[in-house]
Each structure stands twice: as C-alpha cells, then as structure tokens.
A protein has these predicted regions:
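Short hydrophobic targeting helices and cationic amphipathic motifs
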Residues: 10, 39, 47-49, 67
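Polybasic, lysine-rich low-complexity intrinsically disordered segments
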Residues: 13, 51, 55-58
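Anaerobic metallocofactor- and corrinoid-dependent redox/one-carbon enzyme cores
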Residues: 76-89, 94-459
Length: 459
C-alpha cells in the first residue's frame, strides 16, 4: 500500500478509502443501509461492486470507479475549521489573514470554497460617531470621605447615581454653558494623559461626612477607567437627506435643504456586522480591537434589531444589529477615540472598532466576500418625520454622488474609511504576529428581536 492501490491512486486517497467503516478487506457488496450512508451524487453503479480488482461484468464496476467514487465522496464532504485550529496556526505564525476589502477583491475570481481553503481570518473595522458610549471611573476615597451625589469634571456634569466615588461619564454629557465640550472630550483627554478638574458635592452622612471636594485627576491617580459603550458598530444605517427648505442640524451632520447633500455612516464592506450579518462568530466574549487596544464584546448592543428587511444578498438594510463593547482606557490611544461636536446637535465620540471573523466554513467565506455594490441601505428624509423614500448601495455612495428623484446629490461619509482601513490593517498585523488570538462567543446574540417605541401620554 505504500504507493496507493496498484499504484493508481495516492496513498492519501487509499487511506481514506480503507478508513470507511462500511468497507472490508474482502468482498464489497453494499447493503441498503450502507448505500444510504453515501450522499446524493454518488454513482449508482456503486451498488453492484464486487470484489477488489473484479472485472466489470454482470453489472459490477471496476476498481477505478470505486476509487473515483471515494474521491468524489471526499470532495463532497464540507470543509470546516475550528477556533482551536485557527489559533494554533496563529501561534505558529502560519495563519493567513486578510482584511475584508482584500477578501472582497479575492472573491471576484474565487469561489467561497477556494477562499475558505486559502484564508483563516478576515479583519473588519469601523471608525464612526457613536453617541451611546462612555466610561466608568472610580476616583478613590478622600480623608474624610465623601459620598459624591453631584459631580463635575472640567465643568461637565456627570453621573452621581452610582456608589460613593464612582461615576459614569457619558460621551454626550456637556455643560449647557459650553455645549461644544463634553464627556467624549473628557474621555479623550484622560487617555491623552491630561489632568482634569474634579469637583463633587454630597449631603454628608455619618459614614461620609465630607460635603464638598475639589481636586485634580488623571488616569495615574484614579483606580479604574473602563470604556463601556452600550451601543456601537451599527450593522447598517440609513442615508440622511433633507427635502425641506431649511437647513437641518442632526446627528447625521448638517443636512442642506432640497436634498443638496446626503450623509451616510458605515464602512461598507469593511464593517464588522456586514461581514457576519447573523453574528455567527460575534457574541459575548468576542475579543476585538477597541480604540488601539484589545477589548471585548460584552453583550448585544442596545436597539439590537433583527427584524430589518434583507436585500437579495442577505444584507440587513437600515439600522439593524449593534454591539456593546468594553475595554481598558489606560491601554487606549486617542488616535482611535476622538471627542467631536456636531453643529447645533451636540457632543459625540468617534470610536475605532475592529472585529476578526474566523472563516469556519463556506457560509462565512461567502459572507465576508460581500462588496459595496451588494450592500444596500435606505434613504431617509429627515425633513419628513423620517420617511424612507428610496434605497442606494455603498458603491454609489462612495462615488461622491447619487442620482435620486431626478437630482444629482452630493454624498459624504460621517465615518472615516481611512481610519477603518488602518484599524483592519493593525488587527491583521497583530494576528499575523501571534499577538491576538480569537475567542469563541460564550453566549450567542439574540435572534428575532425588534424595537419598541415610546407612547406619548399627552396624545
């Protein structure tokens, strides 16, 4: 058997053939039960196989057909990979890693099966405005201690509703007297190593007698600094236009009257949840790139919506799934976390997120092959109570101009494609160098969810 059966087929094929439990060293007639173990597509003549080497007489099949059938069976078996197999390749420096843009280009000439054979991990990324972001801080106790009930950092009111010296700095927190500066800027400045003014008040109790404190804080002086973002990395998002005669100032930026511009916010084919739209590899415990360091998916994001319609490529259109993310602020870089102010809207925070997608099977290889031309989203009129008035794909949006309702409309992204590409490349480099291994979710994302709305009791 050193060279395979009669030297006709390689040893690998021979070993595969002889390893099948239904085969024996003697005659090879198959029972009906044995026949049913083979998938559709196996040649029917296999039923009448005789002994090894028997000539093709009286309905029997020569051994060449037998081996071809076994080879076909081997090819029909679906190729899969496991997290451990991929991580072992990462540890050995042998993992093949591509960015989502690179694999989308590869998919122009390769089928998902070929991509699965060649690629182990695909890196995805986004860098956009994410208002539902913030940070938990613990300041430590003074002597005598204070139970902080009203807290300001650099003049910005932040939450005093936690424990005595804990707070949550929301990205959109701001001082009404200075609306262009807020929580997002505080978080960025702490990451940059700056000292900020902390002032707090309490009513005074027997165990916390102090009623006021004013001091300076930085990441070096406080205990914990944890970035905690309840809703980030939207799967998709509607394009914003304005059909009215006046300029609108929104979280989608400034919308000019009579549809003179269209604003969108997604990294398109680079976006994490567009490359794994059913969250097969993304769930509680998934390790990610977060603002320059390693962070984690800690839950589904708020407003997680599985009920959005799908286009012909299986891509959710509009505001669909989201992620809740957490990471250590002391390890982050303000290159990938920036405070921002949108005119006449308010403060927000740009957050850099990168998610690795392991190619476990052909379905995932197919999903990560998505291209901008295959990703549709709705056009929403912010001047008419959010009416959905059309749809467009990201290839059209990226061109800088779309034609809609007889008009040529200039398009501009709120998110940074440059930063998203940089994040995907950094994450790719981490994985290739063995500095970042993949984690399987310990809890999957929910399915079948939709959104509730508020009812106005005055109506």
């Amino acid at each position: 058997m050193r060279g395979g059966i009669e030297g006709l087929y390689p040893l690998e094929t021979t070993r595969f053939a002889l390893s099948l439990p239904l085969l024996r060293s003697g005659p090879l007639p198959l029972t009906r039960r044995g026949w049913r173990r083979f998938p559709e597509g196996i040649t029917p003549q296999f039923r009448s196989l005789g002994k090894f080497g028997e000539k093709n007489t009286k309905g029997t099949v020569p051994i060449v057909w037998f081996l071809l059938t076994l080879q076909a069976f081997k090819q029909f078996a679906e190729m899969t990979k496991s997290y451990e197999e991929i991580n072992e390749k990462i540890r050995k420096g042998k993992a093949v890693v591509l960015t989502a843009e690179e694999v989308s280009e590869m998919a122009r000439t390769m089928k998902p099966k070929e991509i699965l054979e060649k690629v182990d991990v695909v890196t995805t990324a986004t860098f956009g405005a994410m208002c539902s972001s913030g940070a938990f801080l613990n300041f430590g106790h003074a002597n005598p201690p204070i139970r902080m009930e009203r807290i300001e950092i650099n003049g910005v009111p932040v939450s005093g509703g936690l424990a005595a010296v804990d707070t949550f700095v929301g990205a959109t927190d701001c001082n009404p007297q200075n609306p262009t500066y807020g929580g997002a800027h505080i978080i960025q400045e702490l990451i940059d190593g700056k000292e900020l003014t902390l002032e707090a008040w309490g009513k005074g109790t027997d165990c916390y007698p102090r009623k006021h404190i004013k001091t300076m804080i930085s990441l070096k002086t406080i205990n914990e600094a944890i970035l905690m973002n309840p809703r980030n990395a939207y799967q998709n998002y509607n394009v914003a236009v304005n059909s009215t005669d006046r300029t609108l100032y929104t979280y989608m930026g400034t919308l000019l009257p009579r549809m003179k511009n269209a604003s969108y916010s997604s990294a398109g084919e680079l976006s994490p949840l567009l490359n794994d739209p059913e969250c097969r590899t993304i769930g509680l415990g998934t390790r990610i790139f977060l603002c320059g360091t390693q962070g984690y998916v800690v839950w589904n994001g708020t407003q997680f919506n599985c009920s959005k319609p799908l286009n012909e490529y299986g891509v959710p259109m509009g505001n669909a799934r989201t992620l809740a993310l957490m990471g250590e602020m002391r390890e982050m870089s303000s290159e990938f976390l920036r405070g921002a102010y949108f005119e006449k809207y308010g403060v927000t925070m740009y957050v850099g997120v990168g998610v690795p997608i392991p190619l476990l099977d052909e379905d995932l290889a197919h999903r990560v092959s998505i291209r901008n031309s295959q990703i549709d989203t709705f056009i929403e009129d912010y001047g008419q109570k959010g009416d959905l008035i059309g749809k467009v794909n990201y290839e059209q949006l990226r061109s800088g101009e779309i034609e809609f309702m007889g008009k040529k409309i200039h398009t501009a992204p709120l998110s940074s494609l440059y930063k998203a590409r940089k994040i995907a490349a950094i994450l790719k480099d981490w994985i290739e160098k063995g500095q970042f291994e993949l984690t399987a979710p310990v809890r999957p994302m929910p399915t079948g969810t939709s959104l509730q709305g508020l009812k106005d009791l005055n109506l």
